[in-house]
């Protein structure tokens, strides 16, 4: 399997086979879902196993991206072992999304407070709210 790599001044992420990393990453995904009262772990796991989403690793975290509807990318999950994952990975997520012709990036979150303010500064807008889960979209092209 060919490995796709994006380089920037701040981050280097590479596409990796989920099956190779599942035993290490799935517990992180599950714990995060539990902590946020947002039952997304099974959907993330299944999308990665079925190759409907793609796993990108960096030295300090990972992100799962799922193309959909021909011109959109959903950030199914993003995690960093250090602070600042959103700021750090946003340029790479946008570059990968543009590379496949995406016009927008979507994510769902239970996070609030400072994270929401950061999302607004990065150009995302809230498009819906169901219970404590909000959906955010950023137009990129």
Where does each model-flagged region fall?
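Short amphipathic alpha-helix that is part of the acyltransferase structural core
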Residues: 1-39
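Active-site rim helix/loop that mediates acceptor-substrate recognition in acyltransferases
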Residues: 33-54
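Conserved donor-binding loop and adjoining core beta-sheet/short helix segment
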Residues: 50-85
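Short glycine-aromatic motifs
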Residues: 53, 121-126
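Short glycine/proline-enriched coil/turn segments at helix->beta-strand junctions
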Residues: 57-61, 101-102, 132
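Hydrophobic beta-strand residues in large extracellular and virion-surface proteins
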Residues: 63-65, 105, 136
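Acyl-donor binding region in acyl/amide transferases
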Residues: 71-122
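Conserved catalytic-core motifs of GNAT/GCN5-like acyltransferases
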Residues: 125-137
């Amino acid at each position: 399997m060919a490995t796709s790599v994006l380089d920037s001044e701040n981050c280097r992420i590479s596409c990796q086979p989920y099956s190779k990393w599942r035993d290490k990453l799935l517990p992180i995904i599950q714990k995060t879902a539990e902590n946020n009262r947002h039952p997304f772990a099974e959907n993330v796991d299944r999308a990665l196993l079925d190759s409907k989403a793609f796993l990108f690793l960096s030295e300090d975290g990972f992100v799962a991206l799922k193309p959909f509807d021909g011109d959109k990318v959903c950030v199914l999950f993003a995690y960093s072992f250090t602070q600042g994952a959103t700021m750090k990975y946003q340029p790479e997520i946008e570059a990968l999304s543009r590379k496949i012709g995406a016009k927008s990036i979507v994510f769902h979150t239970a996070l609030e407070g400072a994270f929401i303010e950061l999302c607004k500064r990065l150009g995302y807008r809230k498009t819906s709210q169901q219970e404590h889960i909000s959906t955010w979209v950023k137009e990129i092209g």
